[in-house]
């Protein structure tokens, strides 16, 4: 059984990347046929809240103090409200391929914020990674600005998708201690509940104005995919992989999402992928790889302690 665990973990990580990669073209197509970005976000947070709360009935119960419940409201603001609103509305404006490439930039934002907030050191690898990632992002944005074609990209959509990654990186940096205290199901059931409470008062009138009778069934299937696979199962598969495999191995699967998204989007005609975008993608991917491979503060501290121990006992 133990021999199968790494294989299962790898399969789960691949599935989560594939689920999220398909979510961009699937969600984009849904927003072209009957619903828009605010509708999709509303369905996603409500569906996620229902699924995670139902699942929590069959998992180990965790006591959450009232003060932490309110902390989850703030966490949900960054991780879901700002993140998903920015990403989904950005996806509605730009191409699925650009949006998926932008999602891989999150580790770069997380590194910069860790330096500012958590005082993590910046190594030369991290600095080079940030420069490469920024160069790639600038190329994508400039390509969108001069294209005049939504299938190539849209500058405002690209910026919104990038701001979504900044929002999620802020969530990871500001709520690191809170996240370490609870299981994924406890974290997500409270954050999705708060996200629903915070988003729906502003979107319910828009959702109710949907001409449901004329929305094609395919749009509802696509919305269901975003909720079930792109949200619920994607998070669970990632959790299984993270519990078994090293972070450096997990980080490799970050690239499954854009590869799946770009391939499917181009095949079905939702995006056009040009040479400059390919160069930009390589820069972003390489930058993220350098950031992820760099040593953290804990790694450096352990190395220093090890050297000190060796000197004392030499």
Model regions and ranges:
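Hydrophobic transmembrane alpha-helices of multi-pass small-molecule transport proteins
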Residues: 52, 73, 113, 122-144, ...
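Specific transmembrane alpha-helical segments of multi-pass solute transporters/efflux pumps
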Residues: 19, 23-24, 53-103, 139, ...
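Alpha-helical transmembrane segments of compact multi-pass small-molecule transporters, enriched
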Residues: 47-51, 102-116, 131, 194-198, ...
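Helix-helix packing/entry segments at the starts of transmembrane helices
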Residues: 11, 40-43, 80, 84, ...
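Transmembrane alpha-helices of multi-pass small-molecule transport proteins
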Residues: 29-82, 109, 167-174, 189-208, ...
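Juxtamembrane helix-entry segments on the extracytoplasmic side of multipass membrane proteins
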Residues: 5-9, 34-42, 64-70, 142-170, ...
